[in-house]
Design a protein with these regions (language model features):
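N-terminal metal-binding scaffold of metallo-dependent hydrolase/deaminase domains
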Residues: 1-39, 48, 452, 462, ...
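Divalent metal-coordination and catalytic microenvironments
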Residues: 8, 23, 28, 49, ...
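Active-site mouth loops of central-metabolism enzymes
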Residues: 59-70, 155-168, 194-196, 232-237
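Divalent-metal coordination cores built from histidine and acidic residues
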Residues: 69-184, 213-214, 288
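Divalent metal-binding pocket/active-site signature
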Residues: 183-242
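C-terminal cap of metal-dependent C-N hydrolases
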Residues: 317-326, 404-411, 416-417, 422, ...
Length: 532
C-alpha cells in the first residue's frame, strides 16, 4: 500500500534545517521525499501545520526484557505515545541474551531489575532471541549483549576474579552475540556480578568491541562524589575515579565508548560535570570515540541495593546481620550521606513486594519514622523484605541547568532508560521524556529543533549502526513520527501522559493516530535489527 504524507515540516534526522515537503511510503519503506509529490497513493494525509521526522529511537533501553512478554504491548504503549519506534536495548550489562540455557546460574539473570516472569521463554543467543521477537512485538529492537548476563552465566554472582576457564567462556558468549548481530556490548559496573570485575576483565570486553567495531556502553561504577564503590571517602570524586577506569580500558584505542546516563547523584556531585566533560575530551584526543546520553529527568530508578558496598552485598544474610558488619556499614553510610548531600530522604520506595504496598511513594526516612526505627535499619528492612530486589526512585540526579547544558553538547544523545513496571510507582520518563526534549528546544532552553530531532533519530542510528533507520531517506524503513510544535510548546510535562505527538508509523504501518492505538497491527509491527 502507498501512503502519502503531505505538506509537513520535514526534519530529516541530519540536523539540517526543516523544509515543507511530502513523504511517500510504499509498503514498509520510504519511497520518496520532496516537495509537492504527486498524489499517487492509496491513502493521503494532509499534515499542514504539523512536523514530521524519522521515528524516534530510544538510545538506552531495557525493553528486550519486555519484548518477550506474552503480552508485550502494555510495556511499549507509553513509549509509542512518545513517538518512539525503535529501541537500543540490553544496557547496563543486563541483557536477556548472552548466556547458556543450561547454566546452573540462570536464576541469577536479570540483575535484580528484571525477570522472566510471564515471558515466552529464555533465549540464550541473539539468534534465538530475534527468532522469537521479530515481527512479534510492537516496536523495533536492537540489542547489546550484557557483561553481567554473560558473567552470571559462568559464575553466578560470585564475588571474585573469574578463573581463566570462566573468563574464556564469558568472552566467548559475548563474541558469539556480536557475530550474530548484537549492536555492541554493555557493562554494568554498579550491578552484580559486573561490579566484581576488575579493570583487566573490563579491558578484555572492550577489546572485543574494538575487534568488531561496535560500541561499548557503560553504566559506570560510581555516579556520585562518594559511593560504596571505592573505600576512600575523601580525595578524588568517585564519579571521576569511575571514569578513570574507563580511561584505563580505552585510552589510545579506537573503542567506541558510550557513557550511559550522565548523572550526578547527590547535590555535592553536581560540580563534577565540568571535569567529567574535560576527561571525555582528553580521552578523545587519544583516539577513543566517546559519546554519552541523558534522559530529561532529575531523578532515576534503580535497585534498592544500589547504595550498598560490594563487600556487604557479597555476604550471606546471616553475615549481613552480624553487629560488627552493621556498625561498619552504618558508619560508611552516614559519612557517605554527609559528603554526598544525599540521604534516605532522597530515596523513595517504588516497589518492595506483595504486602508492602503501604511503603510505595514514601521516602525511607518517612518509613523509618512510621516504623519507629533508624533510617538505616528501615532501609535494610526494606532490602530484606524485597529479597534485596526492591525498586527505588532516587534524586536529585541532575538539575534543569545541567540537562540544558548537555542538550547543547555535540556528543550527547537522548534516551529514556525507563520501563513499565507491573507494580508500584512508575518512572516518569515512560510518559513524556522525548516530548520534554522537544519542548525544551521550542522554549529556548534546549538545542535547536533540527539538532534535537537528530539526537533522538539519526545520531543514535549512526552511533549503533542501525541499518536504514533514523533518517528521512528514500529506501529507508518508514518509521515516522508526526508532532505538533504548538502542542509541544504549550504542553504541561510530568502529568503521567505524553503530549504533542500526533501519529507514529512503524515500518510503514500507522500505529498511533490522534491518541488511538492500532492494537491489532502492533502485535507484529516490530522488527529485530541486526547490526553487522
Amino acid at each position: 500500500m502507498k501512503q502519502l504524507l503531505k505538506n509537513a515540516k520535514l526534519y530529516d534526522g541530519t540536523g539540517a534545517e526543516p523544509f515543507i515537503g511530502d513523504v511517500l511510503i510504499d509498503g514498509d519503506r520510504i519511497a520518496k521525499v520532496g516537495p509537492a509529490l504527486a498524489d499517487e497513493a492509496d491513502v493521503v494525509y494532509d499534515l499542514s501545520g504539523k512536523s514530521l521526522s524519522p521515528g524516534f529511537i530510544d538510545g538506552h533501553s531495557h525493553n528486550d526484557w519486555f519484548a518477550i512478554k506474552k503480552e508485550p504491548l502494555p510495556y511499549f504503549e507509553p513509549f509509542i505515545r512518545q513517538g518512539i519506534a525503535t529501541f537500543v536495548a540490553g544496557n547496563c550489562g543486563v541483557s536477556t541474551i548472552g548466556f547458556e540455557p543450561d547454566s546452573p546460574h540462570a536464576d541469577k539473570l536479570g540483575g535484580g531489575l528484571f525477570t522472566y516472569q510471564d515471558t515466552t521463554g529464555r533465549y540464550g543467543t541473539l539468534d534465538e532471541f530475534f527468532a522469537a521477537v521479530d515481527r512479534n512485538m510492537p516496536c523495533n529492537l536492537s540489542v547489546l549483549a550484557g557483561h553481567c548476563s554473560a558473567r552470571a552465566a559462568v559464575s553466578g554472582f560470585a564475588n571474585r576474579k573469574l578463573t581463566p576457564e570462566e573468563e574464556t567462556g564469558m568472552l566467548a558468549i559475548m563474541e558469539k552475540a556480536l557475530q550474530q548481530g548484537a549492536a555492541g556490548l554493555s557493562l554494568g559496573m554498579m550491578y552484580e556480578p559486573g561490579l566484581y570485575a576488575d579493570v583487566e576483565e573490563q579491558r578484555k570486553v572492550a577489546e572485543l568491541c574494538v575487534k568488531y567495531n561496535k560500541p561499548l556502553t557503560v553504566h559506570p561504577r560510581a555516579e556520585s562524589k562518594v559511593s560504596m564503590a571505592y573505600p576512600q571517602l575523601f580525595g578524588r570524586s568517585h564519579l571521576l575515579r569511575a571514569f578513570d577506569e574507563l580511561v584505563e580500558i580505552s585510552k589510545n584505542t579506537p573503542l567506541k565508548l558510550h557513557y550511559s546516563h550522565a548523572i550526578f547523584v547527590g547535590r555535592s556531585s553536581f560540580k563534577d560535570k565540568a571535569e567529567l566533560l574535560c576527561l571525555m575530551d582528553e580521552l578523545r584526543k587519544t583516539g577513543t570515540d566517546v559519546t554519552f546520553d541523558i534522559y530529561n529527568e532529575c531523578l532515576g530508578v534503580s535497585v534498592i541495593t544500589v547504595i550498598l558496598p560490594g563487600w556487604y552485598q557479597g555476604m550471606s544474610v546471616e553475615e549481613k546481620r552480624k553487629p560488627f558488619n552493621r556498625l561498619k556499614l552504618a558508619a560508611l553510610v552516614k559519612a557517605t550521606s554527609l559528603l554526598l548531600g544525599f540521604g534516605f530522604k532522597d530515596i523513595v520506595v517504588a516497589y518492595i513486594g506483595p504486602g508492602y504496598e503501604r511503603f510505595e511513594g514514601k521516602s525511607v526516612h518517612q518509613i523509618a519514622k512510621e516504623e519507629g526505627m533508624s533510617d538505616l535499619n528501615a532501609y535494610l528492612m526494606l532490602c530484606e523484605a524485597s529479597d534485596f530486589k526492591g525498586r527505588v526512585n532516587m534524586g536529585p540526579y541532575s538539575t534543569k541547568e545541567i540537562i540544558s547544558d548537555f542538550e547543547h553538547d555535540e556528543h550527547c544523545l537522548y534516551m529514556t532508560d525507563a520501563w513499565v513496571e507491573d507494580h508500584g510507582v512508575q518512572n516518569p520518563a515512560i510518559y513524556d521524556c522525548y516530548p520534554k526534549f522537544l519542548r525544551d528546544s521550542l522554549l529556548g532552553t534546549g538545542d535547536t529543533m533540527p539538532n534535537t530531532v537528530r539526537r533522538m533519530t539519526g545520531a543514535i542510528a549512526d552511533r549503533f549502526m542501525l541499518p536504514e533507520r533514523g533518517y528521512l531517506k528514500e529506501g529507508y524503513f518508514a518509521d515516522l513520527t508526526v508532532f505538533d510544535e504548538n502542542m509541544l510548546r504549550a504542553g504541561v510535562p510530568d502529568r503521567e501522559e505524553s503530549f504533542g505527538i500526533e501519529k507514529l508509523f512503524i515500518n510503514g504501518t500507522l500505529v498511533l493516530d490522534g491518541g488511538k492505538l492500532n492494537e491489532q497491527a502492533l502485535k507484529t509491527t516490530g522488527r529485530a535489527i541486526r547490526v553487522k
